[in-house]
């Protein structure tokens, strides 16, 4: 599989290493220096993986859609453009898989948090909350992962779930879901030890999206894998 990488910061470099380790090829690396040539450079690639910046997402989505190259969209801070991005992909009969977090562990954590919310919604006197912490270079707060957790939990607990963010040091990413009462407190925590899991998930999504048309969340990739491997 020939992969075009859009953005070559920390995540882009990790994805490049993961691509090569899997025996695939990095055919092109597109950064802000050559971003104007994106659509042209996409030619001959099987898939593109974008870990650039939120403000560049619409331009990148459109270039991939026009070039008929499936896109794994891993940038953060573009939720306000989500509806427009989906429209662009669908208008060009393109393909895109996106997600607030490409860690397989986080996507399983989503399901645990949602199931826990259903349980606590059935009893009284427990107050839900969400806490997240990341390195001080992360721009968006709350994180996309925290917002996704809140959306999932809100299905059972309503929209008013307090969500707190910390930006400090070199924290790869910690997300905590809590249920607090006068009698006790229950905490569910996901802690990323490195960004390697995000890169592995992005490559998994890249292999999955080939040959498909439409817009998908990474959660759908995980759902399909779970169904395929369930007894």
Task: Describe each model-derived feature in a short phrase.
Residues 26, 71-72, 95-96:
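Hydrophobic beta-strand scaffold residues
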Residues 2, 10-42, 124-231:
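C-terminal substrate-binding/catalytic lobe of Rossmann-fold NAD(P)-dependent oxidoreductases
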Residues 40-44, 54-74, 82-85, 90:
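Rossmann-fold NAD(P) dinucleotide-binding segment
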Residues 108-123, 141:
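Rossmann-like NAD(P)H-binding beta-loop-alpha module
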Residues 62, 75-97, 107-115:
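Rossmann-fold NAD(P)-binding glycine/threonine-rich loop
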